[in-house]
């Protein structure tokens, strides 16, 4: 039986340009038109990572709910956590339209949005009004015209400290000129020192230590991975998110849309991002939490991220093609896979294919 959303998406939503369709989906979630997912909690999926308890390992990645409009509605779809943003100190419009492109044959998306968002103040007001206890992370970035990008990240920590369950410092978007330069070792050391000092200062004031993750690109050299791992362990960071979108266009079927500039996400990113994830797990060791992102489209691909070294996983682009039922289907599917593997917890399967993925081509 064909999923009703897929019929609607291909015949309805896909008639609209991607950015308009995205706005319609946010409106539908706000209005309650999208039904909540009914999932029986599975204690085998529950885990504590970076001091936070996650009911299941599946999260909504940053980029969908940029302005913190629907975090609780997303959690009701079955996600174990969600991440708002990327949010910058001041509002900014991002890059000119069109700036999102569907590659339907590839089940992929190319975007060059450029951190379009309403700024810290608007997102903070919405997060302050939340009544639920779900895990909502805040992805922070820098304004395109900022004269001191590190100061922008520090401002994000200070602004959202009372409402964030965790932070993600996004230094890996390819759509803000020069942003990925912050992944270079000297720049990264300065960034992490400043961000973690701000976090520690706020923790001392509030009595709550909020974990900080770093989101990295998949387009890294081996030396680049070495540098990030070394700095993550030296400071120390609370975790990594692997990975953001890629500039690679290798193996795409839709060569017309592939020519668009921007970051590629969706199914074609799975192999590359999972290989980088495994390489980073090898570098940072067993203790540092890692969230795996890129091409998660099913329970099987979510579990494969975990087998490659992830503690948690996130998705976004694949929901464009699979619809709002995807998170619930994945969570239920993970329970079924644990049955098949006769595993007592999802944690038991982490790293079980680490060597395989670490040896794969990046």
From Swiss-Prot:
SUPFAM superfamilies: FMN-linked oxidoreductases
Lineage: superkingdom: Bacteria
EC number annotated for this UniProt entry: 1.3.5.2
Active-site residues, record numbering mapped to chain: 173 (nucleophile)
Catalytic activity: (S)-dihydroorotate + a quinone = orotate + a quinol
GO terms under cellular component: cytoplasm; plasma membrane
Cofactor binding note from Swiss-Prot or TrEMBL: Binds 1 FMN per subunit.
Any GO molecular function: dihydroorotate dehydrogenase (quinone) activity
Recorded metabolic or biological pathway in which this protein acts: Pyrimidine metabolism; UMP biosynthesis via de novo pathway; orotate from (S)-dihydroorotate (quinone route): step 1/1
Compartments where located: Cell membrane
UniProt: substrate binding residues: 66, 111-115, 170, 175, 244-245
This protein's UniProt keywords: Cell membrane, Flavoprotein, FMN, Membrane, Oxidoreductase, Pyrimidine biosynthesis
Record-listed FMN binding positions: 62-66, 86, 139, 170, 215, 243, 266, 295, 316-317
One Gene Ontology biological process: 'de novo' pyrimidine nucleobase biosynthetic process
Gene3D superfamilies tied to this protein: Aldolase class I (3.20.20.70)
Cofactor: FMN
Recorded topology in the membrane: Peripheral membrane protein
Family that this chain belongs to: Belongs to the dihydroorotate dehydrogenase family. Type 2 subfamily.
Role this protein plays: Catalyzes the conversion of dihydroorotate to orotate with quinone as electron acceptor.
The protein's assembly and partners: Monomer.
Name under which the protein is recorded: Dihydroorotate dehydrogenase (quinone)
Protein source organism: Rhizobium etli (strain CIAT 652)
Lineage, uppermost ranks: Bacteria, Pseudomonadati, Pseudomonadota, Alphaproteobacteria, Hyphomicrobiales
């Amino acid at each position: 039986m064909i999923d009703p959303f897929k019929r609607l998406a291909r015949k309805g939503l896909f008639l609209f340009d991607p950015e308009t369709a995205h706005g319609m989906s946010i409106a539908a979630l706000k209005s309650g038109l999208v039904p909540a997912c009914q999932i029986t909690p599975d204690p085998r999926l529950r885990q504590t990572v970076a001091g936070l308890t996650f009911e299941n390992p599946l999260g909504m990645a940053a980029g969908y709910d940029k302005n913190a409009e629907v975090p609780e509605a997303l959690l009701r779809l079955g996600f174990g956590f969600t991440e708002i943003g990327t949010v910058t100190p001041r509002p900014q419009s991002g890059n000119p339209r069109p700036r999102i492109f569907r590659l339907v044959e590839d089940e992929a998306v190319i975007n060059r949005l450029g951190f379009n968002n309403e700024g810290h103040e608007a997102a903070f007001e919405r997060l302050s009004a939340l009544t639920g206890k779900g895990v909502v992370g805040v992805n922070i970035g820098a304004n395109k015209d900022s004269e001191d990008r590190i100061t922008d990240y520090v401002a994000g920590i200070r602004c959202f400290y009372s409402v964030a369950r965790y932070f993600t410092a996004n230094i890996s978007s390819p759509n803000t000129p020069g942003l990925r330069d912050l992944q270079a070792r000297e720049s990264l050391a300065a960034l992490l020192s400043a961000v973690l000092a701000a976090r520690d200062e706020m923790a001392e004031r509030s009595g709550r230590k909020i974990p900080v993750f770093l989101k990295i690109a998949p387009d890294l050299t081996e030396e680049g991975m070495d540098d990030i791992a070394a700095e993550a362990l030296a400071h120390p960071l609370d975790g990594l998110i692997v990975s953001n979108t890629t500039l690679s266009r290798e193996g795409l079927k839709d060569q017309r849309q592939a020519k668009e500039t921007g970051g590629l996400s969706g199914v074609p990113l799975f192999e590359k991002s999972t290989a980088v994830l495994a390489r980073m797990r090898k570098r940072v060791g067993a203790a540092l939490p890692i969230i795996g992102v890129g091409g998660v489209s099913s329970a099987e691909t979510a579990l494969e991220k975990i087998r490659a070294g992830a503690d948690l996983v996130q998705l976004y682009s694949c929901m464009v093609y699979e619809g709002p039922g995807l998170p619930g289907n994945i969570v239920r599917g993970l329970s079924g896979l644990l049955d098949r593997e006769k595993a007592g917890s999802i944690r038991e399967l982490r790293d079980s294919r680490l060597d395989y993925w670490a040896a794969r081509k990046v």
